[in-house]
């Protein structure tokens, strides 16, 4: 029967779409995953498309897991993912790279000043407490960014620059926290 064959083809297409979606997304947050991140960067580099890469690592995430448990930690990661999705345009990308590490790819040319403002806005947005299971849960974020091709035409170098800036930001955040605890 022709209708049955068409229905089977449509079902197979749906299954293929589902499998592809599962292969490209993080199962917990629904964000795109590291595998897809690597592929997008390769395509952008091959076509010399300008972008800003933001790396983000959560601060104080481990104490949340230790204090409230992994279920609350998972809900927190989902909340962070939702906030990240809310701060990008529809043409941009948000990724969970693993653990409490995230990345954003903002497509098109950008300036250092625009990136610095965006980074500050992301960090402020992530720092707003999350209401999870009746608890106000707070984390911070350390971010770093780099511009392609403005800072390097080598995507690996752009990744290193963003990672180094994130690390420096994390060190500065720890120093501020240590100073605040001493007051």
Predicted feature residues:
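Catalytic-core segments of nucleotide cyclases and related cyclic-nucleotide turnover enzymes
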Residues: 16, 116-123, 127, 131-133, ...
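Short regulatory alpha-helical coupling segments
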Residues: 20-21, 34-50, 81-89
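Conserved nucleotide-binding and Mg2+-coordinating catalytic segments in signaling enzymes
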Residues: 20-39, 56-70, 78
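Hydrophobic framework residues that shape the active-site pocket
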Residues: 61, 80, 94, 102, ...
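A short pre-motif secondary-structure segment
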Residues: 93-96, 137
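PAS-family sensory domains
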Residues: 2-12, 161
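PAS-associated C-terminal cap
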Residues: 11-21
């Amino acid at each position: 029967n022709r209708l049955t064959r068409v229905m089977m083809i449509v079902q197979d297409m749906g299954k293929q779409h589902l499998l592809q979606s599962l292969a490209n997304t993080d199962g917990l947050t629904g964000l795109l995953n590291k595998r897809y991140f690597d592929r997008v960067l390769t395509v952008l580099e091959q076509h010399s498309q300008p972008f800003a890469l933001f790396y983000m690592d959560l601060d104080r995430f481990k104490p949340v897991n230790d204090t409230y448990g992994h279920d609350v930690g998972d809900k927190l990661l989902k909340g962070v993912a939702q906030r990240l999705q809310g701060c990008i345009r529809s043409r941009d990308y948000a990724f969970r790279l693993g653990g409490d590490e995230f990345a954003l790819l903002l497509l098109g040319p950008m300036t250092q000043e625009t990136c610095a403002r965006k980074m500050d806005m992301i960090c402020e947005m992530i720092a707003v407490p999350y209401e999870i299971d009746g608890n106000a849960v707070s984390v911070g974020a350390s971010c770093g960014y780099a511009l392609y091709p403005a800072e390097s035409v080598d995507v690996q170098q752009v990744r290193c620059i963003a990672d180094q800036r994130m690390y420096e930001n994390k060190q500065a955040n720890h120093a501020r926290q240590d100073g605040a605890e001493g007051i």
